[in-house]
Protein backbone atom coordinates (compact mmCIF):
# COMPACT_ATOMS: atom_id res chain seq x y z
CA UNK A 1 0.00 0.00 0.00
CA UNK A 2 3.02 2.33 0.32
CA UNK A 3 3.29 2.97 -3.42
CA UNK A 4 -0.28 4.26 -3.95
CA UNK A 5 -0.06 6.47 -0.85
CA UNK A 6 3.35 7.77 -1.93
CA UNK A 7 2.18 8.47 -5.48
CA UNK A 8 -0.90 10.28 -4.18
CA UNK A 9 1.09 12.37 -1.68
CA UNK A 10 3.70 13.28 -4.27
CA UNK A 11 1.08 15.46 -5.96
CA UNK A 12 0.79 17.69 -2.88
CA UNK A 13 2.99 19.98 -0.83
CA UNK A 14 3.67 17.52 1.97
CA UNK A 15 6.62 15.78 3.54
CA UNK A 16 6.03 12.03 3.31
CA UNK A 17 7.09 9.55 6.00
CA UNK A 18 7.11 5.81 5.25
CA UNK A 19 7.64 3.53 8.25
CA UNK A 20 9.15 0.06 8.01
CA UNK A 21 10.33 -2.09 10.90
CA UNK A 22 13.92 -1.22 9.98
CA UNK A 23 13.76 2.50 9.19
CA UNK A 24 11.66 5.61 8.68
CA UNK A 25 12.10 7.09 5.21
CA UNK A 26 11.29 10.76 4.68
CA UNK A 27 10.65 12.30 1.28
CA UNK A 28 10.01 15.93 0.26
CA UNK A 29 11.00 17.26 3.68
CA UNK A 30 10.86 20.94 4.59
CA UNK A 31 12.66 23.11 7.18
CA UNK A 32 9.93 22.72 9.83
CA UNK A 33 9.94 18.95 9.47
CA UNK A 34 13.74 18.78 9.38
CA UNK A 35 13.80 20.45 12.82
CA UNK A 36 11.41 17.81 14.21
CA UNK A 37 13.25 14.94 12.55
CA UNK A 38 16.37 15.61 14.59
CA UNK A 39 14.56 13.76 17.41
CA UNK A 40 13.94 10.48 15.56
CA UNK A 41 16.13 8.09 13.58
CA UNK A 42 15.32 8.34 9.89
CA UNK A 43 16.75 8.35 6.40
CA UNK A 44 16.05 11.47 4.40
CA UNK A 45 15.55 10.65 0.73
CA UNK A 46 16.19 13.07 -2.10
CA UNK A 47 14.69 10.96 -4.88
CA UNK A 48 11.22 9.60 -5.52
CA UNK A 49 12.23 5.96 -5.63
CA UNK A 50 10.42 3.72 -3.16
CA UNK A 51 10.67 0.52 -5.18
CA UNK A 52 13.45 -0.69 -2.88
CA UNK A 53 10.70 -1.05 -0.24
CA UNK A 54 8.80 -3.71 -2.21
CA UNK A 55 10.18 -6.49 0.00
CA UNK A 56 9.61 -4.56 3.26
CA UNK A 57 6.48 -4.17 5.34
CA UNK A 58 5.44 -0.53 5.31
CA UNK A 59 3.23 -0.44 8.38
CA UNK A 60 2.49 3.29 8.45
CA UNK A 61 2.69 6.40 6.32
CA UNK A 62 2.02 10.01 7.07
CA UNK A 63 1.99 13.35 5.32
CA UNK A 64 3.16 16.54 7.02
CA UNK A 65 2.06 20.09 6.35
CA UNK A 66 1.66 22.88 8.92
CA UNK A 67 -1.74 23.81 7.45
CA UNK A 68 -4.30 21.39 8.92
CA UNK A 69 -7.02 22.54 6.49
CA UNK A 70 -4.69 21.69 3.60
CA UNK A 71 -4.35 18.14 4.96
CA UNK A 72 -8.13 17.87 5.38
CA UNK A 73 -8.62 18.96 1.76
CA UNK A 74 -6.03 16.41 0.68
CA UNK A 75 -8.04 13.70 2.47
CA UNK A 76 -11.18 14.77 0.61
CA UNK A 77 -9.33 14.39 -2.69
CA UNK A 78 -7.95 10.95 -1.82
CA UNK A 79 -9.23 8.16 -4.08
CA UNK A 80 -11.94 5.91 -2.62
CA UNK A 81 -9.70 2.87 -3.20
CA UNK A 82 -7.25 4.28 -0.64
CA UNK A 83 -9.96 5.34 1.82
CA UNK A 84 -11.37 1.81 1.73
CA UNK A 85 -8.14 0.14 2.91
CA UNK A 86 -6.80 2.74 5.35
CA UNK A 87 -7.38 4.06 8.84
CA UNK A 88 -6.91 7.82 8.52
CA UNK A 89 -6.28 10.10 11.47
CA UNK A 90 -4.61 13.38 12.38
CA UNK A 91 -2.01 14.31 14.98
CA UNK A 92 -0.02 17.31 16.20
CA UNK A 93 -1.94 19.65 13.87
CA UNK A 94 0.68 18.87 11.24
CA UNK A 95 0.18 15.21 10.26
CA UNK A 96 -2.35 13.07 8.49
CA UNK A 97 -1.59 9.44 9.33
CA UNK A 98 -2.34 6.30 7.34
CA UNK A 99 -2.45 2.78 8.77
CA UNK A 100 -3.94 -0.41 7.36
CA UNK A 101 -7.69 -0.71 8.02
CA UNK A 102 -8.23 -1.98 11.56
CA UNK A 103 -4.86 -0.76 12.83
CA UNK A 104 -5.44 2.00 15.35
CA UNK A 105 -4.83 2.79 19.01
CA UNK A 106 -8.20 1.32 20.01
CA UNK A 107 -7.28 -2.05 18.50
CA UNK A 108 -3.87 -1.78 20.15
CA UNK A 109 -5.46 -1.13 23.54
CA UNK A 110 -7.73 -4.16 23.17
CA UNK A 111 -4.79 -6.36 22.08
CA UNK A 112 -2.59 -5.18 24.95
CA UNK A 113 -5.35 -5.62 27.53
CA UNK A 114 -6.02 -9.13 26.23
CA UNK A 115 -2.31 -10.00 26.27
CA UNK A 116 -2.00 -8.76 29.87
CA UNK A 117 -5.34 -10.36 30.93
CA UNK A 118 -6.79 -6.97 31.86
CA UNK A 119 -10.56 -6.72 31.39
CA UNK A 120 -11.53 -3.85 29.09
CA UNK A 121 -13.80 -2.50 31.84
CA UNK A 122 -10.60 -1.74 33.78
CA UNK A 123 -8.94 0.34 31.05
CA UNK A 124 -8.35 4.07 30.82
CA UNK A 125 -7.16 5.89 27.71
CA UNK A 126 -5.82 9.44 27.62
CA UNK A 127 -5.64 11.38 24.37
CA UNK A 128 -5.38 14.75 22.70
CA UNK A 129 -5.81 14.31 18.96
CA UNK A 130 -7.79 12.42 16.34
CA UNK A 131 -5.28 9.56 16.23
CA UNK A 132 -6.42 8.80 19.81
CA UNK A 133 -10.16 8.66 19.01
CA UNK A 134 -10.50 4.87 18.57
CA UNK A 135 -8.60 4.34 21.84
CA UNK A 136 -10.77 6.86 23.74
CA UNK A 137 -13.89 5.07 22.48
CA UNK A 138 -12.55 1.58 23.18
CA UNK A 139 -11.48 2.19 26.79
CA UNK A 140 -13.88 1.94 29.68
CA UNK A 141 -12.89 5.47 30.64
CA UNK A 142 -11.80 7.84 27.89
CA UNK A 143 -10.06 10.99 29.03
CA UNK A 144 -9.16 14.08 27.02
CA UNK A 145 -6.29 16.29 28.13
CA UNK A 146 -7.10 19.99 28.56
CA UNK A 147 -5.66 20.97 25.18
CA UNK A 148 -7.29 18.12 23.24
CA UNK A 149 -9.05 18.83 19.97
CA UNK A 150 -12.85 19.24 20.27
CA UNK A 151 -13.61 15.81 18.76
CA UNK A 152 -11.60 14.09 21.50
CA UNK A 153 -13.21 16.17 24.25
CA UNK A 154 -16.65 15.25 22.91
CA UNK A 155 -15.83 11.52 22.82
CA UNK A 156 -14.23 11.45 26.28
CA UNK A 157 -16.08 11.03 29.55
CA UNK A 158 -13.66 13.35 31.37
CA UNK A 159 -11.30 16.21 30.52
CA UNK A 160 -8.25 16.96 32.64
CA UNK A 161 -7.38 20.36 34.03
CA UNK A 162 -3.76 19.86 32.90
CA UNK A 163 -2.68 19.68 29.27
CA UNK A 164 -0.33 17.12 27.77
CA UNK A 165 2.73 19.12 28.85
CA UNK A 166 1.51 19.78 32.40
CA UNK A 167 1.26 16.34 34.03
CA UNK A 168 -2.16 15.34 32.69
CA UNK A 169 -1.25 11.66 33.13
CA UNK A 170 -0.33 12.27 36.77
CA UNK A 171 -3.67 14.02 37.25
CA UNK A 172 -5.51 11.00 35.83
CA UNK A 173 -3.58 8.56 38.03
CA UNK A 174 -4.24 10.64 41.15
CA UNK A 175 -7.92 11.15 40.31
CA UNK A 176 -8.95 7.72 39.03
CA UNK A 177 -6.40 5.15 40.21
CA UNK A 178 -4.89 6.06 43.58
For every predicted segment, state its role:
Residues 8, 12-126:
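Conserved acidic, metal-coordinating active-site core of Asp-based
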Residues 97-178:
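Mg2+-dependent phosphoryl-transfer enzymes with acidic/Ser/Thr/Gly-rich catalytic loops
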Residues 1-3:
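Short, small-residue-biased leader/transition segments that mark boundaries at the very start
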